[in-house]
């Protein structure tokens, strides 16, 4: 299915793909933006849980219950642009610049839980040492 995205919505070098499991309903860009196909609009993102600082988007899930679900934007981006062949090993998604609002595909990488924990601890120690 092709969707004509409004020209004012497009950014240079931005690539769009269907959201995995929501084909034809939602599209995601390499910049971490989510498009609702029905109304051809960029969906708003929000911090559902302020302490985590991750951005979420509310997707309407068409199943037996017909409900909406808050989904992490970085997970949507990675699942759509970089499918995970080894879900047992690479369980976490890391923001390279540590900015959880930067969901550009170039800022995301899959890691094991152990690798991710080590990176985050080193980053926190580095931040603490600067204070």
Predicted region positions:
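Conserved recognition-core residues within compact binding domains
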Residues: 2-93, 97-131
